[in-house]
């Protein structure tokens, strides 16, 4: 269930918030939406969620048109805005039951589903607590439960980790990865690029309402792309490998013809496209007799790319 966007445009007055945007987001993956304030990210998400009409262009969300099929899109999409926005006097359970009813869920099925979602986001102890006493991070978790109440096939998340503590952010990453592996299409916007880097399969860079051209060294993420619609950019992350014997590590990297960069302590850095490639490299090193001490991705690749792109556009 993918997302396809073609020549999408939306004006506010004379100012284009989104301008002739082409984009294709594959199903069963987590795709990040990255850009500065005012780039059009939230406007795009609102149009995808059938909450804002475009001025021109076409959108398909799970094969549905948000303009002509808004109710069907609302059933297929789980929408989590960056602000909670709900009735503070209602309890967490009552809020989820209200949204379940709005989605047409049977009352007998809605209550156990609501309790299941509260448990999923670790708010089961707050089931009877009014929303007004929740912290910002707890409200974010409740917002995620609300977006998931009707088991959507597409998730649209605007700053989902805002206000969350480190444990909650780690839980969010794990949950989104599990949902994607089950086939859910996830598109999320965030300014916390270090967090996004840990969970996304691909990235769409936006600036001035449109998608930015591919940065050097980045490739298209796997998955079908619509005609003329660029796919998200695949994360080509840099990993660091360290071994007990730096010489043997270097020999293995040379014999395997890997494009590595050696560090002063004998560790090496090398580009890794995905987890499967990382597993293959680790297995190859161990099979070659390299006693690997550590092998992990370096953070900051996404932020460096974002800053470089913004620097070029200025």
List PLM regions with ranges.
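Conserved ABC ATPase "signature" region
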Residues: 97, 101, 108-126
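Short, charged/small-residue-rich alpha-helical element at the C-terminal edge
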Residues: 223-229, 234-309
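Catalytic Walker B motif of ABC-type/P-loop ATPase nucleotide-binding domains
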Residues: 155-159
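Helix-to-loop junction immediately C-terminal to a conserved catalytic motif
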Residues: 49
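Conserved catalytic motifs of ABC-family nucleotide-binding domains
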Residues: 151
């Amino acid at each position: 269930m993918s997302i396809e966007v073609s020549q999408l445009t939306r004006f506010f007055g004379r100012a284009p918030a989104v301008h002739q945007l082409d984009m294709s987001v594959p199903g069963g993956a987590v795709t990040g939406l990255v850009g500065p304030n005012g780039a059009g990210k939230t406007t795009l998400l609102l149009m995808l969620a059938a909450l804002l009409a475009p001025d021109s262009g076409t959108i398909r969300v799970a094969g549905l048109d948000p303009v002509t099929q808004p109710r069907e899109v609302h059933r297929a999409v789980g929408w989590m805005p960056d602000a909670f926005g709900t009735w503070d006097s209602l309890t967490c359970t009552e809020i989820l039951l209200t949204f379940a009813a709005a989605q047409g869920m049977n009352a007998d099925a809605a209550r156990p589903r609501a309790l299941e979602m509260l448990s999923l986001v670790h708010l089961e102890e707050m089931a009877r607590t009014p929303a007004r006493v929740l912290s910002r991070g707890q409200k974010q978790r409740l917002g995620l439960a609300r977006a998931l109440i009707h088991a959507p096939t597409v998730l649209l998340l605007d700053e989902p980790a805002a206000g969350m503590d480190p444990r909650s952010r780690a839980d969010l990453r794990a949950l989104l990865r599990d949902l994607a592996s089950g086939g859910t299409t996830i598109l999320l916007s965030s300014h916390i690029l270090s967090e996004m880097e840990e969970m996304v399969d691909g990235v769409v860079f936006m600036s001035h309402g449109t998608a930015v051209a591919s940065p050097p060294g980045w490739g298209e993420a796997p998955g079908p792309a619509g005609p003329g619609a660029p796919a998200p950019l695949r994360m080509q992350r840099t990993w660091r490998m360290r071994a007990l014997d730096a010489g043997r590590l270097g020999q293995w990297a040379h014999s395997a013809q890997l494009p590595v960069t050696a560090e002063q302590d004998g560790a090496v850095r090398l580009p890794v496209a995905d987890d499967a490639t990382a597993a293959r490299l680790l297995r190859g090193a161990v099979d070659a007799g390299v006693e690997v001490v550590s092998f992990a991705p370096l953070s900051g690749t996404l932020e460096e790319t974002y800053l470089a792109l913004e620097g070029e556009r200025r």
